Amino acid sequence: MVIYGLETCAVCQKAQKMLKFEGIEVIFRDIRAEPLNAEELAELIVEFGDNLVDRTSNDYRSLNNWLKASEADAQITAKPKVMARPVIRDGDSLYLGWDDSVQRALLSN
């Protein structure tokens, strides 16, 4: 299982901790240190669409108007912190966030 997020993200840390506690092998990928390539980003955008960008974040609000009007891939490439997180890959399945439905899906296995 791979978690895409930020080392400093409290929700990412919580997800990683809970998954490891359940005995699930987790690889954490900090998207600032190792940005998503174009193919990975395109796959996530196909799966999650505009939900992949956290428009409530301070980082999003700090984007200039041109970037705010751009597509999600341009926004995330320019400022990876605007990506909603965590994104979790479990085999062929992708999950966004760490809400109850994601936890049930991943922790019930």
Walk through the language-model features, giving the residues of each.
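Thiol/selenol-based redox catalytic cores and closely related redox-interacting motifs
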Residues: 31-109
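Local sequence-structure signature of Cys/Sec-based thiol-disulfide redox active-site neighborhoods
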Residues: 1-22, 26-32
